[in-house]
């Protein structure tokens, strides 16, 4: 879908660039495939802020998206493409031959009326699901499982994809958007194609108020705070913080390695940080 610019009637309109969603369904979602979504304002169950600068925003209904696609060898027809406020990608409503409906992530080049299917050996076309071990090398996929049967976890945002670049015994080698290459078990499933809405990366929010509609509050820098609020705070007049950049909790930021999960290091063949070292 194309980008949409607006007449500069106000400063916010002048800067605004949005994705043209005129081709999407304009009605309400299927009620049986939705549930209420409680806004927590960045607080956890004890009421403490765990994510700063969250709060407000438009009320949303959560769409139950099927990331597992366990209904195998049953064709489904794409009924319509919809906007989902809970994610950057678009979603597709599919209807199986037995009458069951489900929401899935809409891949690029999926159109209303197309047929999708999940199975061990299916056609390599957008929206179909099959185990990674049965796919030809070079296939572009999204919604990739990391654990067998857990459901897709990799490449779910707008425009993202992973590519199958090789095989190694029971595993396949996947190249991710970040440049990382990692091993994934061949029995893990993935959906063929890249995720829809690739133009999401080119949008311009236009004004601060639109960010508030999305549930984000103003972000304050540490150097403008008081010493009680941030390690960079305080000082007479404007200061640079007086130390190497740290988080509000005193941990080094801007490049310090924080990964501690050594048990899965063996699955990462090429780190996503390798390109930065060149």
Curated annotation (Swiss-Prot):
Keyword terms: Ribonucleoprotein, Ribosomal protein, RNA-binding, rRNA-binding
Gene Ontology annotations of biological process type: cytoplasmic translation
UniProt cross-references to InterPro entries, sorted A to Z: NA-bd_OB-fold (IPR012340), Rib_uL2_dom2 (IPR014722), Ribosomal_uL2 (IPR002171), Ribosomal_uL2_bac/org-type (IPR005880), Ribosomal_uL2_C (IPR022669), Ribosomal_uL2_CS (IPR022671), Ribosomal_uL2_dom3 (IPR014726), Ribosomal_uL2_RNA-bd_dom (IPR022666)
GO cellular component, one term: large ribosomal subunit
One Pfam family hit: Ribosomal_L2
SMART domains named among the record's database cross-references: Ribosomal_L2, Ribosomal_L2_C
Source organism superkingdom: Bacteria
Gene Ontology molecular functions: rRNA binding; structural constituent of ribosome; transferase activity
PROSITE patterns xrefs: RIBOSOMAL_L2
Function field: One of the primary rRNA binding proteins. Required for association of the 30S and 50S subunits to form the 70S ribosome, for tRNA binding and peptide bond formation. It has been suggested to have peptidyltransferase activity; this is somewhat controversial. Makes several contacts with the 16S rRNA in the 70S ribosome.
Subunit (UniProt): Part of the 50S ribosomal subunit. Forms a bridge to the 30S subunit in the 70S ribosome.
Family: Belongs to the universal ribosomal protein uL2 family.
Official protein name in the record: Large ribosomal subunit protein uL2
Gene name, Swiss-Prot/TrEMBL: rplB
């Amino acid at each position: 879908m194309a980008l949409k610019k607006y007449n500069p009637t106000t400063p916010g309109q002048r800067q605004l660039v949005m994705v043209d969603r005129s081709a999407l369904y304009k009605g309400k979602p299927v009620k049986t495939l939705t549930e209420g979504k409680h806004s927590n304002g960045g607080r956890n169950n004890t009421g403490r802020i765990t994510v700063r600068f969250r709060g407000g925003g438009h009320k949303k209904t959560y769409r139950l998206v099927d990331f597992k696609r366990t209904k195998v060898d049953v064709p489904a027809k794409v009924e319509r493409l919809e906007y989902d406020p809970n994610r950057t990608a678009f979603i597709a409503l599919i209807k199986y031959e037995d009458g069951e409906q489900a929401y899935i992530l809409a891949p690029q080049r999926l159109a209303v009326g197309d047929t999708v299917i999940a199975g061990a050996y299916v056609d390599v076309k957008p929206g179909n699901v099959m185990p990674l071990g049965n796919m030809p090398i070079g296939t572009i996929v999204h919604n990739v499982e990391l654990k067998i049967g857990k459901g897709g976890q990799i490449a779910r945002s707008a425009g993202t994809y992973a590519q199958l670049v090789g095989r190694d015994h029971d595993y396949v080698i996947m190249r991710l958007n970040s440049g990382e290459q990692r091993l994934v078990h061949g029995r893990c499933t993935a959906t063929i194609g890249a995720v829809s809405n690739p133009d999401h990366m080119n949008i311009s929010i236009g004004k601060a108020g639109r960010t508030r509609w999305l549930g984000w509050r103003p972000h304050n820098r540490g150097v403008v705070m008081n010493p009680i609020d941030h390690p960079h705070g305080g000082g007479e007049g404007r200061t640079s913080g007086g130390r190497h950049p740290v988080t509000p909790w005193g941990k080094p930021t801007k490049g310090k390695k924080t990964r501690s999960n050594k048990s899965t290091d063996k699955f990462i063949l090429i780190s996503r940080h390798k390109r930065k070292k060149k």
